[in-house]
């Protein structure tokens, strides 16, 4: 296997109920959809759905720690971190934006959570409707460079998180209707082919 063997996190895994929250470190999870395909939506919804890439991460260091402390005080024992462009991937530094966390920063935050009884779980969303964080790779779905990038960043994250117990890969809203709906094929098109020809 090309996935590295690592030592598990030093936090004791939750027993009994898992009480978890999802936090988005990156903000470029959504694609820029053409509004003419969205139907009757409110102006606020259209603005959200047609977001341009954001060039900074979602959190200040102070706010992140406040939320982690609040979660611990509320009895949360797991935080799923939607990484996106919020982590500096050693294999793909081109995915970083302003404020992207270094490997050392992420490890320090994982340690901070572990010390408060919170297990850190990584999430990378590979759904074609939430892959804006991939930059140019989001337009290469199902290609060899795309799969190489996916493998690389998964390997990076497994190592950085110290062999997490879980790894969330997103893929919400990934369904057969995207393959059938001609208005959605722009999401999946790559060099004249479509994703279902794998």
Question: Can you describe what each PLM-predicted range is?
Answer:
Residues 2-198:
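Feature activates predominantly on carbohydrate-active enzymes
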